[in-house]
Regions:
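Transmembrane signal-anchor hairpin modules in multi-pass inner-membrane enzymes, especially those
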Residues: 1-88, 92-116, 172-188, 215-239, ...
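Helix-loop-helix junctions and helix-breaking kinks within/between transmembrane helices
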Residues: 16-27, 77, 154-157, 188-220, ...
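Hydrophobic alpha-helical transmembrane segments
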Residues: 64-71, 96, 105-141, 154, ...
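A membrane-periplasm/extracellular boundary helix in multi-pass inner-membrane enzymes
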Residues: 123-132, 140, 196-202, 206-210, ...
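TM-adjacent membrane-interface loops and short helices in multi-pass inner/ER membrane proteins
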Residues: 155, 271-311, 317-331
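Hydrophobic transmembrane alpha-helices and their immediate junctions
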Residues: 326-366, 537
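Alpha-solenoid helical repeat scaffolds
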Residues: 452, 481-485, 524-528, 558-565, ...
């Protein structure tokens, strides 16, 4: 049952846009919580149940506790809570998988399941690439990803993150695994399909990371006498095929030639985002700005070269330092170090000695080697992207970590702990707490999300929208986004000239202020409050709210535009023109509304030539 729940959670997360949307992640969270409940039952019903608790478990538990403490101190509680729930979901998945799925057969099942699923998604990605389809399961994924394979993910880079973890596992088993000929052929085709899918993502970071993982696997196998020729042949084949495809495919050549993502002089590029993340960490070196607070605080740190609002730093290491500080990063780093030490020790133990007369194959060795190299590839990709913050990829990585840690029992018996007193009650309390939090949150945020999405689908400013958003607010009054949308609904109704528009504007102003209190780093509630007051002629009262928006977003082109709009409403077109020009300068292509208003001002100031 636990294996089915874990497989369902992993598979659904991969298929459902990587689990990035709240409505899909809640299902994943519920499945993981249910698996913890089943484990809790097993702890008390299986008489000889033992707990597998190697040293890395203490580091995992310590970081989970640290995340709880930091969440209680966070400036934006709702955002921090959502991040905490993700961390607790991964923590639960790790402990459940480690203590219930440590058999070799379960590792083989999950390997085939994930590799098979990724292979099917590569065919879907090939369709996206060949037809220039820009949708995922019928939903638009954005113009920037046209003619790139992303499978069931929105971003091709994150699909590459999944593939780079699984290709080394499949390749190691094909070359050196103890497997029947038919299975070797099928898995070989899967490996080739995933390699093709990785190429079609056009993710340069994915190519480098995937190549790194494959290189580690094949070099490790080439050092083993029994696998040397097969590994060297694989290296030669991959180099020949890869070079031929790259030289004959224009889209691959074009992607290699375009490198603006790392150009420090270009706008909206990774170096610009990394600079902001670095400064954020320097200002909060020990504790960071808070769980998942990078996006909330980014506007204060960006330069006029960056008009985008990235959710993450496009570098998991900088993102971790910015969010968690040195203390949190040290806990995460300790976890990875303990895992690496244990994994390498296990690898040495499960490796078979070279045979004198025949090749000795080992499924344990190939899985451990492939999974280690796949995780190394993911860590390499983390220097230029945020795959560890994509739930599906994070969960696959956690599952591999748990399975590898479970294989440590082949290296030592030190990790086993009897489930007698006091361990059984203690671990039961931990599992009960994790399962209880996840199941409660699934129900609680499930209700909120249902009402909120209903409000999003309704017509702007309609009674239906306001009723749905109020219902969501009643369930969860900490969500600044709900308050923001309620304010916007009342503002739209007021600006439509509805009866009592002044009271509606004041109602909107009140909701915007609630949103600003819940998330003081978002400029939108501030300048929307000012717009409501401008609408009813209270220009002097509106000015402080635009100042507040500018304080939290000093280089934002949308904020600059709204300040210009305020000056225009106040009867100062000269000041408005200055802010519209500033807005235009803060982004490329220039902000279209600012250009429109600037043309209107210049047209009105130009005297009629007459004839």
């Amino acid at each position: 049952v636990i294996l089915g729940l874990v497989a369902a959670a992993l598979g659904f997360a991969v298929l459902a846009f990587g689990g990035v949307r709240i409505q899909e992640f809640l299902i994943v969270e519920g499945l993981v919580g249910a698996s913890a409940v089943i484990w809790l039952i097993r702890i008390w019903t299986v008489r000889d149940h033992r707990l597998l608790w190697p040293p890395v478990c203490w580091a995992v538990l310590a970081f989970a506790g640290w995340a709880v403490w930091r969440t209680l101190q966070a400036d934006v509680q709702y955002v921090a809570w959502a991040e905490l729930i993700r961390i607790l979901t991964y923590t639960t998945l790790f402990f459940v998988s480690l203590n219930n799925l440590h058999r070799q057969s379960t590792a083989q099942f999950l390997t085939w399941f994930l590799v098979g699923l990724a292979t099917l998604l590569c065919f879907y990605g090939a369709y996206q690439f060949a037809t220039s389809s820009n949708t995922v399961w019928g939903l638009d994924r954005g113009e920037g990803y046209t003619h790139r394979a992303s499978g069931s993910y929105v971003c091709p880079n994150h699909f590459a993150g999944l593939l780079e973890m699984l290709i080394p596992v499949a390749l190691a088993i094909v070359v050196a695994g103890r497997i029947k000929p038919l299975g070797r052929i099928l898995l070989g085709y899967c490996a080739l399909a995933m390699l093709a899918g990785l190429a079609l993502t056009l993710s340069r970071g994915g190519w480098i990371a995937g190549g790194f993982g494959i290189f580690l696997v094949l070099v490790a196998l080439a050092r083993h006498r029994d696998y040397r020729w097969a590994a060297l042949a694989s290296i030669a084949l991959l180099l020949i095929v890869g070079g031929t495809v790259a030289s004959k495919t224009r889209s691959l050549q074009k992607r290699l030639a375009v490198a603006d993502d790392l150009n420090p002089q270009a706008r909206n590029t990774r170096p610009m985002i990394w600079s902001a993340a670095t400064q954020m960490w320097r200002d909060h070196p020990w504790l960071g700005v808070g769980p998942a607070h990078f996006a909330e605080r980014f506007k204060q740190y960006r330069t006029h070269w960056v008009y985008a609002e990235p959710e993450r730093a496009h570098n998991d290491y900088l993102d971790g330092l910015a969010d968690w500080g040195i203390a949190g990063a040290a806990l995460v780093g300790t976890t990875w170090v303990l895992f690496a030490v244990g994994g390498l020790r296990t690898l040495r133990q499960v490796r078979r000695d070279p045979g004198n007369l025949e090749t000795k194959r080992s499924s344990r060795y190939t899985f451990v080697l492939g999974a280690l190299c796949g995780l190394a590839a993911l860590l390499a990709h983390s220097f230029t992207d945020f795959n560890l913050h994509i739930p599906a990829n994070a969960m696959v990585a956690v599952a591999l970590l748990a399975l590898l840690t479970g294989f440590s029992r082949y290296a030592t018996d030190d990790g086993w702990v009897s489930s007698k007193v006091p361990w059984r009650p203690l671990i039961s309390v931990v599992v009960m707490a994790l399962a209880g939090v996840l199941m409660w949150d699934t129900w609680h945020r499930g209700q909120e999300t249902s009402h909120f999405l209903k409000g999003r689908r309704a017509r702007d400013g309609s009674n239906e929208q306001i009723e749905a958003l109020l219902a969501a607010w009643k369930v969860e009054p900490r969500n600044a986004i709900t308050a923001l949308y309620l304010g916007e609904a009342y503002r739209v109704r007021s600006w439509a000239g509805a009866e009592g528009f002044e009271k509606l504007a004041e109602e909107a102003h009140g909701w915007f202020q609630r949103a600003a209190l819940l998330n003081p780093y978002n400029p939108i509630p501030h300048f929307r409050s000012g717009m409501c007051l401008d609408w009813i002629g209270r220009h002097d009262d509106a000015a402080p709210f635009y100042d507040a928006a500018l304080k939290v977003d000093p280089q934002g082109r949308i904020t600059s535009f709204h300040i210009g709009w305020h000056h225009l409403q106040s009867g100062d077109p000269i000041k408005a023109r200055e802010w519209f020009l500033r807005s235009i300068d803060q982004g490329y292509p220039p902000y279209a509304p600012a250009e429109t208003y600037l043309r209107l001002i210049d047209r009105d100031r130009t005297p009629s030539s007459g004839r």
